[in-house]
Amino acid sequence: MKCKFCSREAYIKIHYPKMYLCEEHFKEYFERKVSRTIERYKLLTKDERILVAVSGGKDSAVTAYVLKKLGYNIECLHINLGISGYSEKSEEYAKKQCKLIGAPLHIVRIKEILGYGIGEVKTRRPPCSYCGLTKRYIMNKFAYDNGFDAIATGHNLDDEASFLLNNILHWNTEYLAKGGPILPQQGKFIKKVKPLYEVTEREVVAYALAVGLEYIVEECPYARGATTLDMKGVLNELEEKRPGTKFNFVRGYLKKKKLFEPEIKEKEIKECKICRMPSSGDICAFCKFWGLKKEINFKVSSTDEEPFGP
């Protein structure tokens, strides 16, 4: 098949809207789609300092690459989770990605600052639970300590549709009231944005291959059997039969999101006695779980690795 816009061979078939695109026109299409998402939801401005959380995977790498290409002021943060055999590979991919992108890279290794890696802590909590807590805290604290205006993550349309379906099935109305492509800044909680909110996982993979971004393909050993994978499977079946299902599902939710806002429960926000970050109690969940006695200061004067790129 030929590209819709030129005589070159098609690189990819876009299912919604249905069209064939060559590699060059696909890259233009993808970048334009991300740019429009940023503009539509007022995610970012060119004068903001943006911290992109890069895991070594495809989504975060593509997020950093596109934001850099669109002219945004980005730096990257990689959190090494201390998972033997997996985290070492992830860090190496993050380094390669930032070298190609030309973005400064900061690295936080939790085993060095907390004493244990994910999966090494003696606790009844599943690894995914305290891993998520740890990553969210470090991303926000690092961004706050270093004066960033926003944190950008690599959540794509498939991720958002699966989260949405799971939260509807469990009637998690607080998530439904707060979900979406942007979480505005609130005090010491830095603004979080999702530039890939309306692009599919398939499109992200195709773009990464087109621009030469290598990424880790192995899944985290603790992610197997995760509910998200089940939700994605259901949505993929629906998408196969009715192209546009994921997009319309997520867009429809955003139109009706205000219906859930009365469900938001106002919580008293305190300041953690240890790290001075926002907390619902005297000690925040992060400091409590890791047994911290003093604040971790993530302020840096230069990147942990030399800034990559030109």
UniProtKB/Swiss-Prot annotation:
Enzyme class: transferase
Binding site for ATP: A53, I79, K135, G154
Annotated phenotype, changing D59A: Loss of binding to ATP
EC number: 2.8.1.-
Binding-site list for Zn(2+) 1: C3, C6, C22, H25
Family membership noted in the UniProt record: Belongs to the TtcA family. TtuA subfamily.
Cited function: Catalyzes the ATP-dependent 2-thiolation of 5-methyluridine residue at position 54 in the T loop of tRNAs, leading to 5-methyl-2-thiouridine (m(5)s(2)U or s(2)T). This modification allows thermal stabilization of tRNAs in thermophilic microorganisms, and is required for cell growth at high temperatures. Can use free sulfide as sulfur source in vitro, which may be also the sulfur source in vivo.
Protein name: tRNA-5-methyluridine(54) 2-sulfurtransferase
Organism: Pyrococcus horikoshii (strain ATCC 700860 / DSM 12428 / JCM 9974 / NBRC 100139 / OT-3)
Gene that encodes the chain: ttuA
